[in-house]
A protein has these predicted regions:
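Catalytic alpha-helical scaffold of carbohydrate-active enzymes acting on polysaccharides/glycoconjugates
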Residues: 1-48, 53-113, 129-188
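Surface-exposed cleft-lining segments at the edges of enzyme active sites
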Residues: 117-127
Length: 188
């Protein structure tokens, strides 16, 4: 149903471990495992990738070479702002060609007076008030800019079993936040 409705399925790794907690070889193996599962599920072509927890940063740019090697054409893995976990503020909000072969499409931000906040997917979409998300979307549309959004199955599926995200280093607060407001998603 997802494919026939015109939606794209992108790759997000199998184990959801941040890039800086893996070697390039571990990342390649984890990526391949996820790709194989998606192909078995009926995905015909994988073009897009998003790193767990937006962990593609200045220090983990080696991942672009592996993404290119595996045939990806774009990544939406950079959070171009300061964040308690990951972020690459100096990257900027513009789409950029990386390593001459793959596009990086940074996550959509809501520009506040003194800082910017991610607003268009997953945790941010679930926890921010709807007025803020709507205002952010309108801001981008008024400037003819796209809004990039994403959702995990657990963002919508309130029946999915609770689990500790490996990339959050067993931090109970961050893991608690990951499950907040799941019941509000479909209404939004």
């Amino acid at each position: 149903e997802i494919f026939s409705a015109g939606h794209e399925i992108a790759c997000h790794t199998h184990r959801h471990v941040p890039l800086d907690q893996q070697t390039p070889e571990e990342f390649r193996d984890d990526l391949r495992r996820n790709m194989d599962g998606l192909y078995k599920a009926g995905v015909e072509k994988l073009n897009g990738f998003r790193a767990p927890i937006f962990s593609l940063t200045k220090k983990t740019q080696w991942a672009y070479d592996i993404l290119i090697e595996q045939g990806f054409t774009y990544s939406s893995s950079v959070l171009p702002a300061v964040n308690p976990l990951y972020g690459w503020p100096e990257f900027g909000a513009a789409f950029r060609r990386m390593h001459d072969r793959i596009w990086e499409l940074p996550i959509t931000l809501f520009p506040w007076r003194f800082f910017s906040v991610p607003c268009a997917g997953g945790l941010y979409f679930r926890t921010l008030p709807l007025w803020m998300t709507t205002r952010a979307f309108r801001h981008h549309w008024d400037q003819s800019q796209p809004v990039l959004s994403y959702f995990h199955p657990y963002d919508i599926d309130t029946e999915q079993e609770y689990f500790m995200h490996p990339g959050l280093k067993d931090n109970r607060f961050y893991n608690w936040v990951m499950y907040q407001n799941r019941g509000t998603m479909l209404d939004k």
